[in-house]
Design a protein with these regions (language model features):
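N-terminal catalytic or cofactor-binding beta/alpha core of small enzyme domains
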Residues: 1-46, 51-161
Length: 161
């Protein structure tokens, strides 16, 4: 069950304050980190991980992982192929760009043509949480191990590219 966070719209001065004090500095720091990586290595890759529900709005089960690259605009296809291989070889189901193709971060920081890449990774909650939204220790260890493997393989691949 979802809980209401705000029962009414925030006052405009509060919204402006949050944008100025949180949103803008955060995104400036992200861009600065990507610029630094790009300057140093000639490329960068931003991985934006999210938790997703186990079923869509029509109660249809979702894949274990949904990867979004805005329909091949933000990620080198070779990196996408490598991610597909790692995830499916670990025994997980995978979908690309549906129902999540990528959001604000993927769109704003992914420019595959300039070697500043981004990928959105949605992870199905049922892999690491119980139905009561508590941590499933076994599942969370498996997901942590897979994410570590992804990081290691991508680091190695990008270092050699």
């Amino acid at each position: 069950a979802r809980e209401v966070i705000h029962r009414q719209l925030l006052p405009s001065d509060e919204v402006e304050s949050r944008i100025a004090l949180v949103h803008k500095p955060y995104h400036q720091a992200v861009q600065a980190a990507l610029n630094k990586a790009h300057s140093h290595f000639g490329r960068s890759l931003l991985i934006d991980c999210h938790s997703m529900p186990s079923h869509d709005q029509h109660d249809k089960p979702l894949a274990d992982f949904v990867l979004g690259d805005l329909h091949h605009r933000t990620l080198d296809p070779a990196i996408g192929d490598l991610l597909t291989k790692i995830i499916t070889e670990a025994g997980y189901s995978l979908a690309w760009n549906h129902p999540y193709a990528g959001g604000y971060i993927t769109k704003n920081y992914g420019r595959a043509a300039t070697r500043q890449q981004s990928i959105q990774i949605e992870i199905n909650r049922r892999l690491y949480m119980t139905r009561k939204y508590t941590l499933d220790r076994h599942g969370s260890k498996n997901i942590a191990a897979l994410l570590t493997r992804i990081g290691e393989v991508l680091s190695d691949k990008l270092a050699k590219a």
